Amino acid sequence: MLACLQRTQNAPGQHLACPSKSLELRKCEAVASAMHSSRYPSPAELDAYAEKVANSPLSIKIFPTNIRVPQHKHLSRTVNGYDTSGQRYSPYPQHTAGYQGLLAIVKAAVSSSSTAAPAGPAKSVLKSAEGKRTKLSPAAVQVGIAPYPVPSTLGPLAYPKPPEAPAPPPGLPAAATAASVIPLPGRGLPLPPSNLPSIHSLLYQLNQQCQAPGAAPPACQGMAIPHPSPAKHGPVPSFPSMAYSAAAGLPDCRKGTELGQGATQALTLAGAAKPAGYADSGLDYLLWPQKPPPPPPQPLRAYSGSTVASKSPEACGGRAYERASGSPLNCGVGLPTSFTVGQYFAAPWNSVLVTPTSDCYNPAAAVVVTELGPGAARELAGPPADALSGLPSKSVCNTSVLSSSLQSLEYLINDIRPPCIKEQMLGKGYETVAVPRLLDHQHAHIRLPVYR
């Protein structure tokens, strides 16, 4: 036996057969395998052992001699004369530091792992780190026994959820319950992804409401009223931002609106009157300048809806202008010449380009941006109405159209509120996540998720 052990120590990587025939080969192989066995049990073995003795937690397990069990002197080590077993040097919270170092098997109703805290009430005795027997109450058993950090420090940071919007009156359509997108300065950080499905579900409800055959047309349109934005520009009230007011007694915004000289800080776009058999047209979007324009020599008429911008009474002949990276806005706007629109236009999402005369028309249809005379401004002119008569009529209250319009309006001003919404149904102070900005190479294959 001693010769076998000596030969094994000389060549530890080989299982040598004993040359002496007086010793059995089986004993020699057993000794050699014991020398190479693992000293500590694996987690699977510990779990199996915990399940086996779960019904009798006070059973005694005699470990073999080749497995080292940490002793009490190993738990209270000192470094430079200081005791490091106290809570001061422990990287774990206080309620778990008292039980570090020893494995405790607690009897419970369902016990799947020795390191997890049992779900049911338990009465057991285990040794603490100081080697003293401690009775555990059911309240103390719920604390994690294994020396792991608190679960709250392992997960992501919890964000407070914004307050829920009040429920609308039953008589109002579901399209008026969408939350507004207001990225205020200082609070413009994106919310956690747990709040993202809410705006998509609201957009989907908005889409379904506006695509209904019997949907009320005023549910998808709103009147825009300018007011100064002190949150963005401080005390300077000359930079207007747009608030979608929502009184129930507003005049019909589907008729052409005359803009006087005093109301030129923001352009209110309203749809023109449509024939009786025409399908419900789209949103009346809003485009506002970044600085107050000079008063025009004569009142302007803003057209949107089914009216072709090139056929408006104020439109005059002009040269064709190249499209400035595509505008998702679906309104033909009469703007003063001091405001240049092209540099703010963003690339359309899903490669869908919406124009005043289209209801989510085919992206292959050409869009011509004309630059009008010196007294007028650039307008977005789409294909004529007869060219779109053969296309399937869709409502512009579409998820992609709404998101593309919001994305383009984000380049104009920091305060964005979605159209198709009346502020009466919104309440005050509710904020949701803003539509993210896209780079130039990201506009081709992006689709917003729709929850059905």
UniProtKB/Swiss-Prot annotation:
InterPro entries, sorted: FAM222 (IPR029340)
Alphabetical list of Pfam families matching this protein: FAM222A
Family affiliation: Belongs to the FAM222 family.
UniProt name for this protein: Protein FAM222A
Organism, as annotated: Homo sapiens (Human)
Gene name, Swiss-Prot/TrEMBL: FAM222A
